[in-house]
């Protein structure tokens, strides 16, 4: 083989510049999303660049969207949804409504306006769009009025008519007149402390078919463990699991999510737990996915009650897990 030709070929393949690497990396993160929308959300800078914090947030939301897409489309295909009867998704603790905007853009706006209707630089055209539009209505629940107002203005600017923003606590969202009697999907991304429990209660009360939770800062259980530490340290060696404050927080977090999964199984949901993103992006990356099957597991309810008793958390049976009724027999 002609080695000079081989060398010449290598020499003509110039290495990628840092700018090219940055562009490819940004395209990989931004994907099919609307660049103008990401700029309006301040995820991208005015120049269309990503900073480290924005990169982390966008990767988290995009990964969640990827995990949601298949079950969401399956749910949409299982019923006769239309413009007059759309699939309803409710996002609790919406904050700046990143998730709601990106979901609506991904499943509705890109199809109704068409990719060709936007400038070539507005989207990553390397990715091919093959999915059909979805009849989707998105409710974003947020307690901070300034965020709700800004999100509503942004939705109006982009013509996202299927998005609604409610300035209300998650625990009160179900009683709002704008809220349908039944919803299809409930999400709560990085839902702090008991917000995940409020989202679960909302989802169950509204007969939600799908629930996606990324819990965060589970302080309630840790506080209860701390309060009963002195009593239980003399009753059971299990109390060593929460004798030290650091272990109390860790155990409280783990135990809370385990009990939430059991609770959902007891109420007729099939539950899976997976990782939202890699550890390098967030330490709070546990994703709980629940799909309603109607098959209530009595064993799950029994084990939930047993755990509450074992760890001195019986009070939660009347608050967070009130739909599980005692006594439970095999």
Descriptions of predicted regions:
Residues 2-39, 47, 51-55, 62, ...:
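Class I S-adenosyl-L-methionine
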Residues 96-111:
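Conserved SAM-binding loop of SAM-dependent methyltransferases across substrates and taxa
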Residues 60-83:
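Conserved alpha-helix/loop element of class I SAM-dependent methyltransferases that forms part
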Residues 124-126:
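Intrinsic-disorder-associated, low-complexity terminal segments enriched in Asp/Asn/His/Tyr and depleted
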Residues 109-114, 129-134, 158-160:
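Short helix-capping segments at alpha-helix termini
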């Amino acid at each position: 083989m002609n080695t000079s030709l081989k060398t010449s070929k290598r020499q003509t393949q110039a290495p990628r510049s840092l700018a090219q690497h940055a562009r490819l990396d940004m395209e990989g993160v931004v994907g099919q999303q609307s660049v103008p929308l990401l700029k309006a959300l301040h995820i991208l800078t005015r120049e269309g660049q990503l900073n480290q914090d924005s990169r982390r947030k966008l990767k988290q939301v995009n990964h969640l969207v990827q995990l949601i897409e298949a079950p969401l489309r399956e749910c949409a295909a299982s019923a006769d949804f239309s413009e007059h009867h759309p699939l309803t998704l409710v996002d609790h603790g919406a904050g700046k409504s990143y998730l709601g905007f990106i979901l609506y853009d991904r499943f509705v706006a890109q199809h109704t306006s068409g990719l060709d209707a936007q400038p070539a630089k507005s989207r990553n055209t390397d990715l091919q769009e093959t999915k059909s539009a979805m009849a989707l209505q998105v409710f974003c629940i947020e307690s901070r009025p300034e965020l709700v107002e800004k999100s509503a203005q942004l939705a109006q600017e982009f013509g996202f008519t299927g998005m609604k923003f409610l300035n209300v606590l998650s625990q009160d969202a179900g009683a709002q007149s704008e809220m349908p009697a039944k919803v299809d999907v409930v999400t709560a991304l990085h839902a702090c402390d008991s917000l995940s429990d409020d989202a679960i209660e909302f989802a169950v009360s509204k007969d939600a078919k799908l629930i996606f939770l990324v819990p965060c800062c589970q302080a309630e259980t840790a506080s209860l463990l701390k309060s009963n530490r002195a009593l239980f340290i003399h009753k059971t060696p299990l109390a060593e699991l929460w004798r030290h404050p650091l272990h109390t927080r860790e155990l409280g977090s783990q135990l809370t999510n385990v009990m939430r999964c059991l609770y959902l199984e007891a109420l007729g949901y099939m539950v899976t737990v997976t990782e939202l993103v890699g550890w390098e992006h967030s330490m709070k990356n546990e994703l709980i996915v629940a799909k309603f099957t109607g098959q209530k597991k009595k064993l799950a309810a029994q084990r939930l009650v047993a755990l509450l008793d074992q760890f001195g958390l019986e009070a939660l049976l009347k608050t967070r897990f009130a739909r599980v009724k005692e006594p439970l027999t095999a």
